[in-house]
Amino acid sequence: MKRINKDYLYKLTNNYIKNIDISIKDHYINEYNNKGTKLQRINKINSWDNQLYKFNKKNVINTWILDRLVSKLLIKIFKVRVNIINNNIINNGQIKDIYINKPKFKHTINKVYINFNYILSSNNITINDIDNNMNKYYTSIINDINNILGISNNNNNNIINKDNISNYLSKLYNKKVIIESNRLIYHYNDNTILNKMIINNMEKHKGGLSGKYSKILRTNIPVNNSILIRNKYISSIINNNYIKLNHIINLTSYNNLNILNIYNTLNLNKISKDLLINKYIIGLNVLYKGKNLNTAGISRSIKDRLLLGSLSNKLYGKYSNFLSSSLINNNNNNLKLGSSNINTNLNINKSYKLNYIPNHHNIITNNKVNKVKTGTFGITTKLNTI
């Protein structure tokens, strides 16, 4: 790590800065002159990633070039790949990534502040899987990063490594450089880091781009992980049942267990809210699954997607009469979803006796799909969300 540090610091020597090709500076000057001669065009004070103001246009260009060089340096340093050898956590050779967003610069009269976010990421473990050994490993990496960058400890302003990047950059800027790093826990706390993570992991999943994108989001964003929400809800039920049974066995511990309040944490409405809080309901999925009783082992299933809103397909094809406000006048038999009324007088929870399921099956007729023969036919529904 120390060798890598010296290699990057070598590129930032005063000799390197002074010997930058003049044509590069002219390129930037011409680029901004083409946009106008106003100094505000090159003044980065209104930019989200740089606050800089100098009265000399040449000094502005030179400082801005130096900022871009330092930004690339920090991004390169955080591309270090670390092999984890602990077989109890991850197999040998597994790579851990360190993602960083674009650093932000703030120039004052006598100081330069450099602020950025970063996250330690692993492909095979999650936050909940981190044990004490992994915490020690993370702490070791964070300490190494702080020593390389010259970030002082919260409890001690003394930096162990005096030959750090902060001190070296201070010589280049001719003013004190303070590097402020913010370690993130979740990728979605920073959109740049989230985009880098998605791009880096896109090829690690099978299927199309939309499927890969959905899998990555479900894994890294807890509010979109329906499996995590379901398991959490089931764990709450198991835990409450355990408390209840334990109370029945030990009746003397009534006051300590507070048995009357153990189900306050369970809310049937809350789990549906958690599952749909970041999703848009766009319609229904209706699954028809049947089997011919006379022919063992043969079954068929068909899925119909009934879409509403801007993606509505109710005006086309076989769904043209399924969603209609004129089918049933009784409001008790209508389910309002968006601006349309869905005919719920179809007894979709009933098992229908059918001989077969046609390839283009339609449920819009008033006879409630009653083609009675010798088979059984079940219908299930599910919300369509994006």
UniProtKB/Swiss-Prot annotation:
Q: State the GO CC annotations.
A: mitochondrion; ribonucleoprotein complex; ribosome
- Keywords, ordered alphabetically: Mitochondrion, Ribonucleoprotein, Ribosomal protein
> Which residues belong to the signal peptide in this entry?
none
Keyword match Mitochondrion: yes
Where it sits in the cell: the answer is:
Mitochondrion
Is Ribosomal protein one of the keywords?
A: yes
Q: Which family does it belong to?
A: Belongs to the universal ribosomal protein uS3 family.
Task: Provide the function of this protein.
Answer: Essential for mitochondrial protein synthesis and required for the maturation of small ribosomal subunits.
What is the recorded name of this protein? Small ribosomal subunit protein uS3m
Source organism of this protein record: Wickerhamomyces canadensis (Yeast)
